[in-house]
Amino acid sequence: MFKVFGALSGKGSSDSNGNSTRSSINEKRTKLILKEANDFEIALRAMDYVLDDRTEEGLALLRENEKVNGQNQTITVLARGVIEFLQATLSFEMEEIKNASNTLAKAEQLSWKSRTEAQKSGIRNSSIYPPGTVYAVTYTESCLLHALLMLFTESMMDAAKALLKLRKAYSMLHEIMEVVKKSELSRKVSSSSAVSIQSNGSFVSEEATFVSADIPYQLSETESNDPELWAFAEKIYKMRKLRLSGAHIGNTPAISRLRSGLGLSASNKSEELANSEQSVLSDEAAERQATIDEFIHSGVNLCYGILQVVLSLIPPAIGAVLSIVGFRGSREEGLRLIWKATKDRNVHGCIGLLGLMFYYDGPFQFTDVDFDIPPALSNTKTSDSDTDRDGSISIDEMDGHALLHPGPILEEALLHARALFPNSALWLLNEARMLSSRGRLPEAIELLDSIDVESIHMRQVKGLLVFDKAITLVHMQEYERAATNLLSLLKISDWSHAFYTYFAGCCYLENWRMAQMGFIKDDKLEFYREKAEELIFSAPKLLGKKTFKSKNLPLDRFMLRKVEQFKATQKKLGVKNILDAIGTSPIREITYFYNGYNRMSKSDLEIAQKMLTSYHNPAIDQHDPDQELIKNLLLSLTMRRLGDVESGVKLLDEKVLPSIYYMQNGKVKYIKKTEDPWAYPTALYERALFTWKLDGVDNLSECRHWLVTAQNYAGDYELSTRVGMKIKAALDRVEESLQHGTA
């Protein structure tokens, strides 16, 4: 495309028939601009096929385009890279990470070349942004996604390279963001259709007039009456219109599937909406928006937003270094930008929504439901967020509290995605996660059971869905079913066969204990015992056989340490049955890692409390200080979730915290322990939550004290990243509230 840009910009043209030459050049320029918009629409369509669990159709579409344009077209290579990035981040498998990294590296190079050539030519493909802007966006998108993949490998060399890429992306995104902000202001000033007609390409015939948003200038009289140009421009308009309605990948218009709420029992929207073929699931002005402009601002919002959120969650030791070299992340600004990206009906909006759902409702849940700190001080104690309960707050109006508790806005966005991509289990999985985060566990399982796992084409999504189903079943204490699902992952996913096996063994162990306690029938008691022993103690043998990293995963290292502890306890006590050498239930620990205590029902919490306090074996009865610490930590937060906050904090203060720190001359002194390193900063984090539940905003300064104390319990241990990010997210919310309250 760019080989002819020099001629199209008027450089080097000296034809004696000036007007004819100019007309010919203008027509070629217009055709190329339309072709570029067409290629972007094809790429957007291909990526949407993947989001509808039809990866092969998406890749086939890209291959067809490559037959015409070759294998070095920037947007096609980026689209392939985005598809491979999604596959890699859903599976975390090394081979897929390598493939995606190679493709994104190529997309970076092509984007830089395309941007440079577009700037030299001076030809505008946008009425809003300067030449080359769209390729600045493809460059930063390639950089950002590539850097994230590098960080996933946990290689020191790759991490250093990733920081350089993030720096490049950060600098360019900041520059583009300023252009985007200026364009948004100018659009607010002049957004009338009359202006649009004058500034965009208008085609005229005796019967009709058609305005193409994709041509950012007025057409000559010859072009305006060119039927070939008209047909091409109208084709792109129709492609965009079909994409906005969700009908571009062969599905009926998405509005016909839009439901009123979560879960299988939710009804569809009104017949009137369902029968409207013209309805779209985005802004009314979207059809009149140029494809290139849409790609630019949605891409910038997504990439800059993700970068800001990631930087805001980085532990302080690394964050301090990054801030010195110019990196600064704002969680609130980042979330707001990602929310803006979701307004666009394209892959950027979908990736943004997936990121938001992981942030709000994912297994780790960075916004702890027990820590619902508002963005500013008030005189009220904690209460459930009433932000946007009627769905009346728009994304543009979201303040700090709404960003923390998006409520119906997030639900509505997910329901739109479910309607747009009815064939994809990825969106069904996220709906189940949302139900689970709201404590609607049986409905989540019902939804997950509604799809035949074997019908899912994307192996990565299949693995995620089965794992999430297992976690949800664990929260419901249906351990045998959970174990069956976990073991089935050995044939689906290469992520960590060792942890899957250990996790399944812990499920059988808890069933064995519950059968002994009379919570379930004891007719399979011996089966549970045999399976627990077999799986827990065979898991370490699987390390390194099915892992995507050069070193063991954090949960692999956690599992290995626990198994070694059990063996050491058996040797110390001399017990014949090795299961009697296991103290505090390991499944209760894993339940905490996946946010189970915030999701369990009252009856399941009561069973958990009973199992923690009333089950006995030789390992438990020796009252080992380390096992007692974990038991009392888990018991205290179980009590808090059951509403007995006073008893919970008393237990934590008296039985847990004295083993972790003490005060000396007004300063915190840590008791460094290594037996279960995740538990020590976690206990301090949970103490901050207790203060919040007891005193609300009246004692946010003490909340901050506990969170700072937790954060400063520094150490590189197997789950330090997960625990550290959770602590930092809470500390940021507390500090924001304190700052706003004293302003």
UniProtKB/Swiss-Prot annotation:
UniProt subcellular location: Cytoplasm; Nucleus
GO annotations of cellular component type: cytosol; mitochondrial outer membrane; nucleus
Annotated segments matching region Disordered: 1-25
Regions of compositional bias (Low complexity) in chain numbering: 10-24
Pfam families reported for this sequence: Iml2-TPR_39
Recorded superkingdom: Eukaryota
Keyword Oxidoreductase: no
UniProtKB keywords: Cytoplasm, Nucleus, Phosphoprotein
GO biological process: cellular response to misfolded protein
Record note on quaternary structure: Interacts with lipid droplet proteins.
Function: Inclusion body (IB) resident protein that interacts strongly with lipid droplet (LD) proteins. Involved in LD-mediated IB clearing after protein folding stress, probably by enabling access to the IBs of an LD-stored soluble sterol derivative that acts as a chaperone in inclusion clearing.
Family of the protein in this entry: Belongs to the IML2 family.
Name by which UniProt lists this protein: Inclusion body clearance protein IML2
